[in-house]
């Protein structure tokens, strides 16, 4: 058959089809590029369609399979969402923390094993996950299906052997040593945890009565928990040693530390804030410290960094330089001045910037 003008209808339809596919290909690639800016390889495979270009040449550039393969390659180079997650269970604090990298993103109270049937320490991993588990009584083989009467609650996270993290039908046990070795959680908490993990992530079970951390506002805080398993004796020197890693051991009063050890109530004990210290734009290896509304500077090390000679009089508790004299505070092995004395003693003025760094000029 022919249309007017003598061009075969079938041939014309094939040419129009090729042109339509080409235009669709170009617009389709542009739309994909807008949504996925890193998927930019497809356009290099697209040829300009002419009457001489066969449909067979154009078709591979517009297949969904090719675009999906490109996206798949892109995704393979990205870290999976769960790759750097891990669970840490501290039996002393009776807390379970879910970490993303080094950042704790969720924390829940738990009920670990009784002293007579303690939860074992060590590294494990999530081996299986089950919704609506059935509990089997180890003594009678009686089966209790998931529900309000089931000791496992509605979620089971197996961590090897007969041990697991699960819900409970005895909510009052949370915060105590109550189980036969498993880790009980409040039902809402275990369901939340269940939704944010996958099989295979590590589970670290530790026993640490002393926990030290630094808050986002730079405050170093320590917590002392009871020795529920009778495994870890602590004294003031143990606390000081841990605090020294943050540079704040000198700011922890020994009497206050002793009181915290005696109470062992898990309440926060605030020591000092630790600020990175900059001198005329250069970051120093020393730090500024905030405590009780004051900022303290390690004066001898700071004076050396500024090229200023400073002398400490231990009897008078005073620091002197060519510029002036100021009171000093001896904490541990370092001498500090109040930052408000820096202009007089060192001809330097300072402030906290928005990143909570202390800058001196």
Question: Where in the sequence are the language-model features?
Answer:
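Sec-dependent N-terminal signal peptides
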Residues: 2-35
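Primary recognition of N-terminal secretory signal peptides and signal-anchoring hydrophobic helices
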Residues: 6, 24-32, 254-361
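Exported/periplasmic cell-wall-interacting domains
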Residues: 20, 32-39, 45, 64-66, ...
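Cell wall/extracellular polymer interaction/catalysis modules
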Residues: 32-128, 209, 220-228, 244-268, ...
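Extracytoplasmic
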Residues: 82-84, 91-93, 105-107, 121-123, ...
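Solvent-exposed, acidic/flexible segments
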Residues: 89-92, 117-120, 150, 176-179, ...
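Solvent-exposed coil/turn segments that connect beta secondary-structure elements
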Residues: 92-94, 101-103, 113-115, 129-131, ...
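Structured segments of extracytoplasmic/periplasmic soluble domains
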Residues: 99, 129-132, 188, 192-196, ...
């Amino acid at each position: 058959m022919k249309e007017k003008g003598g061009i075969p209808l079938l041939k014309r339809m094939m040419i129009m089809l090729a042109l339509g596919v080409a235009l669709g290909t170009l617009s389709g690639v542009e739309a994909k590029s807008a949504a996925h800016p890193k998927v930019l390889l497809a356009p290099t495979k697209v040829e300009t369609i002419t009457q001489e270009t066969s449909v067979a040449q154009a078709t591979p550039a517009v297949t969904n399979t090719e675009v999906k393969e490109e996206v798949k390659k892109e995704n393979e180079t990205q870290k999976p969402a769960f790759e750097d997650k891990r669970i840490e269970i501290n039996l002393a604090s009776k807390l379970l923390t879910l970490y993303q990298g080094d950042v704790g993103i969720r924390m829940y109270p738990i009920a670990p094993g009784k002293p007579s049937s303690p939860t074992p320490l060590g590294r494990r991993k999530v081996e299986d996950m089950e919704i609506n588990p059935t509990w089997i009584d180890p003594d009678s083989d009686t089966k209790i299906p998931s529900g309000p009467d089931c000791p496992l609650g509605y979620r089971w996270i197996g961590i090897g052997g007969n041990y697991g993290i699960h819900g409970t039908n005895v909510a009052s046990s949370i915060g105590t040593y109550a189980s036969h070795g498993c880790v009980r959680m409040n039902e809402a908490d275990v369901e939340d945890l269940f939704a944010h993990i996958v099989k295979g992530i590590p589970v670290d079970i530790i026993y640490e009565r002393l926990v030290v951390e630094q808050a986002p506002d730079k405050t170093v805080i320590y917590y002392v928990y009871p020795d529920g398993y009778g495994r870890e004796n602590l004294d003031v020197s143990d606390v000081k040693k841990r605090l020294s890693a943050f540079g704040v051991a000198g700011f922890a009063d020994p009497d206050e530390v002793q009181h915290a050890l005696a109470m062992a109530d898990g309440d926060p004990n605030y020591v000092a804030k630790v600020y990175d210290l900059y001198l005329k734009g250069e970051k120093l290896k020393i730090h500024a410290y905030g405590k009780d509304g004051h900022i303290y500077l390690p004066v001898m090390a700071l004076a050396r960094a500024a090229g200023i000679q400073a002398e400490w009089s231990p009897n008078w508790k005073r620091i002197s330089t060519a510029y002036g004299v100021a009171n000093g505070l001896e904490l541990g092995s370092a001498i500090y001045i109040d930052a408000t004395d820096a202009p007089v003693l060192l001809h330097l003025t300072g402030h906290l910037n928005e990143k909570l760094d202390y800058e001196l000029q």
